[in-house]
């Protein structure tokens, strides 16, 4: 998930994934509240890898390293207002290669 506005509600959504399914979040910054939410989350649920990356304005969801969705608003706002999920007809590597080869990022421990 690439989303600059992650909060506890997004972590809760990710906690519903099946055993063995990994989750990675790329977000702009880790606030003190998000740090607290991440610490609480990892005590109760399977881990979520979190990276900071300041080079994305839009939100994307990559599923199974193949399907790419462009999301019109932060997942934290799901159900609050109308916004679109659009499946993009591009390989996931178009997005992931930018993150791993072009843009610098830092893993959050």
For each feature predicted by the language model, list its residue ranges.
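PLD/PLD-like phosphodiesterase catalytic module centered on the HKD motif
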Residues: 2-109
